[in-house]
Amino acid sequence: MAITKTSVTLLLLIIMAASLSNFSVLASEIKPTGRVDNQCKEMCSATFGDGKCAADCRKAGFSSGRCLTSSPFGNKCCCT
């Protein structure tokens, strides 16, 4: 009986501690870590491909870049 009472008390303390903890870290706003200005500037071509695009993006402070050909980008070098 004493073990059950101790176990229930410990369980209630854990539940109470978890409910009183600050969980705002999980609900915090996601903010971009890099630059957020126009990320698709240069047009890609036969001479300006993924390699040059990635190099230019790294020089501009982005982590990477590649040529995107889908309709909203229109064959531009987009940095990420």
Curated annotation (Swiss-Prot):
Signal peptide interval: 1-27
Gene Ontology CC terms: extracellular region
Cell compartments where the protein resides: Secreted
Protein's UniProt keywords contain Isomerase: no
Stated name of the protein: Defensin-like protein 44
Pfam families: Defensin (PF24552)
UniProt keywords, alphabetically: Antimicrobial, Disulfide bond, Fungicide, Plant defense, Secreted, Signal
Keyword Hydrolase: no
Chief site of localization: secreted
Organism in which the protein naturally occurs: Arabidopsis thaliana (Mouse-ear cress)
Biological process terms in GO annotation: defense response to fungus; killing of cells of another organism
Disulfide cross-links: C40-C79, C44-C67, C53-C77, C57-C78
Transmembrane segments: none
